[in-house]
Curated annotation (Swiss-Prot):
GO terms for cellular component: cytosol. It comes from Haemophilus influenzae (strain ATCC 51907 / DSM 11121 / KW20 / Rd). Its main location: cytoplasm. Keywords: Cytoplasm, Methyltransferase, rRNA processing, S-adenosyl-L-methionine, Transferase. It holds the Pfam family SpoU_methylase. Specifically methylates the ribose of guanosine 2251 in 23S rRNA. It catalyses: guanosine(2251) in 23S rRNA + S-adenosyl-L-methionine = 2'-O-methylguanosine(2251) in 23S rRNA + S-adenosyl-L-homocysteine + H(+). It is an enzyme of class 2 (transferase). PANTHER family: 23S RRNA (GUANOSINE-2'-O-)-METHYLTRANSFERASE RLMB. This is 23S rRNA (guanosine-2'-O-)-methyltransferase RlmB. The keyword Metal-binding does not apply.
Length: 246
């Protein structure tokens, strides 16, 4: 089974981290971009087929999404699950995890993956139900982070959170607008799982009940909430700030 990846950063990331998955690459004919030539040189050296096509063909393949003149057809990645998460955590001393509960927009998933990578998160955990798929759009928005940050799909999110607490000694912190303690009042330097809920609805009840602590982002203006990917960035980089200072 194959899937498409588009955008220079996303294709570069697959080339760097999983070149064996590349099947063929489509490039816009006449495209002049200094970032493209090193990519083409690497593809040629690996013997990966490159086809130069017109814009109409690329636009059709990308379903109208921005593709930056390059699309790769790749073998579908293996879906990671709870067992893979245990292996990842076995080698980490002070892990930071991002948990997304009910985030169904692929743009938001991609943005959260990109931020998770920048913040040093070892994995992003999502439930199998009511969660965005790692589509071409999500990979494009992730800007290569979809190949570097493991995306773990779990059958039962509440059970996974309990396992993190009991078997990996990870503190589970959930975000909730009504929480009286803000992220800036919380100590977030140890092994941690940050749980972000869907926009509007927030975390599901069982997810909330399995959090060790609830925190909020203080809002100084008239809006009552932030986009989930923006809120994720605020929270993750407050955690990064605290860790750097500890």
């Amino acid at each position: 089974m194959s899937e498409q990846i588009y955008g220079i950063h996303a294709v570069n990331s697959i080339l760097t981290h999983s070149p064996e998955r590349l099947i063929e690459v489509f490039v816009l004919k006449g495209r002049e971009d200094k970032r493209l030539q090193p990519l083409l040189n690497e593809l040629y050296s690996l013997g990966i087929g490159v086809q130069f096509v017109n814009r109409q063909t690329l636009d059709k393949k990308a379903d109208g999404e921005v593709h930056q003149g390059v699309i790769a057809r790749v073998q579908a990645a293996k879906e990671l699950n709870e067992n893979d998460l245990d292996e990842i955590l076995a080698n980490k001393q002070n892990p930071l995890l991002l948990v997304l509960d009910g985030v169904t927009d692929p743009h938001n998933l991609g943005a959260c993956l990109r931020t998770a990578d920048a913040a040093g998160a070892v994995a992003v955990i999502v439930p199998k139900d009511k969660s965005a798929q790692l589509t071409s759009i999500a990979r494009k928005v992730a800007c290569g982070a979809a190949e570097t940050v493991p995306l773990i799909r779990v059958t039962n999110l509440s059970r996974t959170l309990r396992d993190l607490q009991q078997n990996h000694n990870i503190w589970v912190v959930g975000t909730a607008g009504e929480a009286t303690e803000t992220i800036y009042q919380s100590k977030l330097t140890g092994p941690l799982a940050l749980v972000m809920g869907a926009e509007g609805e927030g975390m599901r009840r069982l997810t909330r009940e399995h959090c060790d602590q609830l925190i909020s982002i203080p809002m100084a203006g008239s809006v009552s909430s932030l986009n989930v990917s923006v809120a994720t960035g605020v929270c993750l980089f407050e955690i990064v700030r605290q860790r750097l200072g500890s």
